[in-house]
Amino acid sequence: MADKPFIISGGGIGGLATALGLSRVGHSSIVLEQSSRLGEIGAGIQIAPNAFNCFDYLGVGNEMRKEAVYIDRLRLMDALTGDEICHIPLDTAFQERFGNPYAVVHRADLHNVLLEACKASGLIELRTSHPVTGYHQEGGTVTVRILDKQDLKGYALIGADGLHSAVRMQMIGDDPPRVSGHTTYRSVIPTEMMPKDLRWNAATLWAGPKCHIVHYPLKGWKVFNLVVTFHNDVKEAMTGKPISREEVYRGFEHIHPRPRQVIDHGIDWKLWVLCDREPITNWVDGRVALLGDAAHPMLQYFAQGACMAMEDAVSLSHRVGTCNNLDSAFAQYLEDRMVRTTRVVIDSSLIGDHIYHPSGAQAALRNSFMQAITPAEWFERLAWLYGGGKPLEN
C-alpha cells in the first residue's frame, strides 16, 4: 500500500505502539518526538487483560510480563472508616475468564519495552527534538511541518501527540482541554517507607468525599506508587509541578488516619490537574488520523488511558495491513474505536463521581451496591472492557 513511510507524531506509549504495529504488517514509519529524549513522565500504570492482548499482538508480551507486578486484587476501601468496601479477586478464575492477568508496572518500564522493540526493528526510525506543528495533504502524500526543521513527506500522518496535540488542533480546531477540577498528587517511595499495615499486593483505592488515594507496589516490590486526588475545583491546568506535603495534606484532613498516613510517608510530591475533552465522532482527515489522548483524552478513573492508546495502535495497524487502501483502513479504524473509546471516556467520568468521590447517602448507596456484586458478576460486567485489545476481523 505505502511507497513512503508513515509519520507518527509523538514518541509516547501510543506512538511507539503504533510504529510496532505498522512494522508487524510490513510498513515503515518515522516517529517524531518533540522532546530531546524519548521517555515517559509519571510512575505507575495499571495494565488490564486488554493491555496484555495488545502487548501480544505487538510482539512484546513476554518482555512486558517480566516487568509487571502481579497483584492479587483490586481493593476498594472507605477513606472515612478505614474499612474495606469490596474487592475484585485477580486470581486463577479471573485469568481463565480473560485469558490474561491484571498487573501494574512502572510507566517508564512499559515505555522502555516498546522503545527497545522499536530500536530492534529495521522498519522504524526514531527522531527526537522534532515537534510537529501541522500538515498539508496533496495527492497520495502528506507533508508534515516541524518546528525549525525541514518539512517531511510521508504516506500518512498519525497524531499520537497527546492531550495538547498540534495535529488535532489543525484537524478539529476545538477549544483547549476541559479542566476537570480534580488535582492529582503523585509520589513514589521505597517499600520500607510504606506503612507496614498497608503493604498489600493490591491496587488499593481509598474512596472519600471529593478525594481518593491509590497505592500499589512497583518494580518487583522495591517501591510503592502513591496517587492522591482531591476534587478542589481548580480552574487551571498544570503538569508535574513540585508541591509540598503540607499542601497535599489540605485535601485529606477529614479522612481516617489509616489512609492518611500514606500522605505522611510520601516524598517529592508532584501535582497534575486532570483534563479531558468531550468525545468526538471523527478523528480522521484524509491521510491523517489521531490516536490515544489526541483522539479521546479521558480521566484516570478507569485506569484505561494507555490501554486505549495501545488498542488504537492494534486496530489501526491491523486495518492498514488488511484493507486495500488507506481510506478504507482509516474508516475501519474509526469504526472500530469511536464508540468503544467514547464509552470509556464517559464511564471514566461517571466512575469518578459515583465510585471515587461520593459522600453521604450516595456513598452508602455505592457501598451497598458494590458489596452485593459477586466476583463472577464483576467478571461479566468487565468483559466488554477486558476482552478488548485483539484485532477485529469483520
Task: Give residue spans per PLM region.
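Conserved N-terminal helical subregion
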Residues: 2-6, 23, 48-190, 233-251, ...
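Conserved mid-domain beta->alpha element of the FAD-binding
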Residues: 6-36, 158-159, 185, 215, ...
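Short, flexible helix/strand-to-coil boundary loops that buttress conserved ligand/catalytic motifs
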Residues: 42, 58-59, 68, 88-89, ...
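Acidic/histidine metal-binding catalytic segments
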Residues: 66-69, 125, 253-271, 326-331
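A short coil-to-beta-strand element that immediately follows conserved catalytic motifs
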Residues: 178-182, 199-202, 223, 244-246, ...
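Active-site substrate-recognition segment that forms the wall
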Residues: 201-236, 245, 249-253, 274
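C-terminal domain-closing interface element
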Residues: 355-374
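C-terminal auxiliary extensions adjacent to catalytic cores
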Residues: 371-394
